[in-house]
Amino acid sequence: MNTKSKAQQVFGEHAPQYASSSVHVRDDSLDIIEKFVDGTKYNIAMDIGTGAGFTALSLSKFSTLVIASDPTSQMLQQAYNTYSNNNIKHISIVQNIAEQIPIKDGIIDLITCRKAGHHFSNFKSYLEESHRILRDNGTLVIADSVSPEDLEAEKWFNDIELQRDLSHIYNRTPTTIKNLLHNAGFQLQCEKTTRIYLQFSSWVARTGVNPQHINSLKQQFTEASANIKKHFQIQNSDNDISFSWPCLVVKCAKITKTTR
């Protein structure tokens, strides 16, 4: 099974859970995105890896037209329901993977991608595609969970996420992401870090973790080293486990060939 079909399987089977997930509906990362794009009216905006469509819904306040893109048809149906329920008519839906975007060169004013980049099989190709379809000096805003700049924490984070979600590819460090952006032709304009606050029970339920595997995952949280518990704020909470992932939000501008 390839990575694309893994993502479609995981998110296709559990699209309703993501549509009702509080950390996907709205959290600090979406608030930061709105602050980053507020004050500008965009002609065409595109949200890549839109999932249930909440970021694209937010962009509709700042854009004449929004394109919501995702590889999973069930997720796009949830997005369509979200827009219909809010009587939003200027959002178009497109099904595609992030590494192959069916859009002409240089016509998009704003691209966003929230909590999806760690699922992309080729993050570099996604950035290259974003650069291709953005107009000169167009804006790219990415928000995603990131690994700490600590090898033990980076390994633990990615191992635990892959056990919970077979479509997981990699949570990169902030340094890695910013280097990839620079190499793809983007200039960092501003950045902000925040946290994604989670509860273990809803975290495993969202991807339908096999009940027989839940105890193994829980044990890896409770028996994690002090370093891991500090990085991810792991603690017992009302018969559950609370924790948080670091999240990086960056706003970048496409650098034109004449200025690179």
Give residue spans per PLM region.
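Conserved Class I S-adenosyl-L-methionine
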Residues: 52, 123, 189-260
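Conserved class I S-adenosyl-L-methionine
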Residues: 1-40, 54-58, 74-78, 82, 141-163, ...
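Class I SAM-dependent methyltransferase SAM/SAH-binding core
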Residues: 46-100
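A short glycine-rich, Lys/Arg-flanked "PGG" loop and its adjoining helix->strand segment in the class I
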Residues: 124-136
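Short catalytic micro-motifs in class I SAM-dependent methyltransferases
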Residues: 115-116
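Short alpha-helix
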Residues: 170-185
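A conserved beta-strand element that flanks and buttresses the S-adenosyl-L-methionine
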Residues: 112
